[in-house]
Amino acid sequence: MGKLNIYEEASRCLLCQDAPCTKACKTGDPARAIRAIRFDNHKPALRWVKECSDADLEHAQQACIHYNWPIRIKEILRSIHPDDVDDSHYPDLTITFCGIRCENPFFLASSAVCTNYEMVANAFDAGWAGVFYKTICLQEIKEVSPRFDAMHNNATHGDFYGFRNMEQLSENTVEMDFDILRRLKQNYPTKVVVASIMGQKEEEWVMLAKMAEEAGCDAVELNFSCPQMKHKGMGSDVGQSPELVKAYTACVKRSVKIPVISKMTPNITHITEPAAACVEAGADAISAINTIKSVTMAPDAEVTGRRTVSGYSGRAVRPIALRHILELVKMPEKTELSGIGGIETWRDALEFIQLGCNNVQVCTAVMQYGYRIIDDLILGLQRYMVKRSVSELSQLVGERVPLFMNPDGLDRDSIIYPKVDRERCVGCGRCYVSCMDGGHQAIDFNTDTRQPRIVGTKCVGCHLCRLVCPTGAIIPTKRIAKK
């Protein structure tokens, strides 16, 4: 089984709670090993099954409750080579954000994943470094049902690439929420507790910020970006006005001594305009992005026959979030950044860090897979640092920013031709179809041998064929000068 198929098969795993496969295996934890592969840590996966015999893994496979057919646990794990990274010298992931020590860069984003004491405490116990607690306001919050829907992958119903929500802010009383934050900070003094707040006028912003400071919070986040607020003058409507966000940031900065973080909306043409206004008003950091306004005709998005605009998140929004982060990091008004948007694996988080974020916030992936994903977020980032011989996480912050330039600065005098790997090719012809109908008609397809052939004189190196190939049989060659 090749590497591609290892991931493909592991992606079928249901990621069960109290996994039957592990209960059936007396010598290891195959469920944890499969989860490591699922979240982009395939090489260290063997550490959880190093004592397992073939018979143990066969018992685990027989116990699998997948609704189609059992995950091929033994075949997956026996296909993995031993880890090439020494796990006895993993670096710690300590980093500072707004002058606050964070034990790692991974925070819960203000959302449904952190709405009460027990949830946040469980996340802290699991290894999350901090929380941007669900946004607190003075208005009464009433939610709709249902309020979530998703864009599913075809293969697995429970796995989705895009997620939509109509949820607003905390339904708790203000007093209840700040008591929760006070207890969290008292009981978890090494964790970072950030109060996310939202007001309708200056007096409300000031009042809530002072309550956050009095509760012992490490910082306060000003939510200028929720896209589905029922109340006027709140959420992303405010975030689109540089004048308003500047005024609200300034009044909070005058009122408290703890760091102030302004949260930006992506539902705007130039995110740098309100962000710069916040920095000018004294904001200590910018967090971005919140969810993207969206609509769908899916049945799950309907409430008694009616629909509304709601917020879109998940893996699909990550490239959009990264683009906003790039714009923010290039602002003349320099500030620290907290990255949000589509983070699911350690590689996703690394992209935000390399574009200038000192920490990252996660929501949708936690809603899908639980707080336990922190294990692989930490493990993957540590292994990456070892392989790069990087001793401190701060060395990675912003290191990829210089790679980005305007389109006119890119090399247009060279080309990378694709090549067909005959061993992997199954002759489906998908590359031919896409190149004929969406490319440059640079692939011939022999219907007798079912073999595609790339025509070099027509190929422009767009790589559409490589992207649509379901078996990974089309690979890039070396870059050469155009003829």
Name each region found by the language model:
Residues 1-9, 27-50, 396-417, 430-451:
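Short, charged low-complexity linear segments at domain edges
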Residues 1-3, 76-90, 313-327, 332-334, ...:
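Alpha/beta catalytic cores of nucleotide-metabolism and tRNA/nucleoside-modifying enzymes
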Residues 2-19, 42-63, 415-419, 423, ...:
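Immediate flanking context of iron-sulfur cluster ligation sites
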Residues 15-39, 55-79, 352, 430-448, ...:
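Iron-sulfur cluster-binding cysteine motifs and their immediate structural context
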Residues 34-107, 111-114, 128-129:
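Iron-sulfur-cluster electron-transfer modules
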Residues 83-193, 199-203:
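N-terminal capping/small domains of soluble enzymes
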Residues 121-126, 200-338, 344-351, 355-359, ...:
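Alpha/beta enzyme core
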Residues 143-156, 297-311, 365-390:
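C-terminal helical cap(s) of enzyme catalytic domains, especially alpha/beta-barrels
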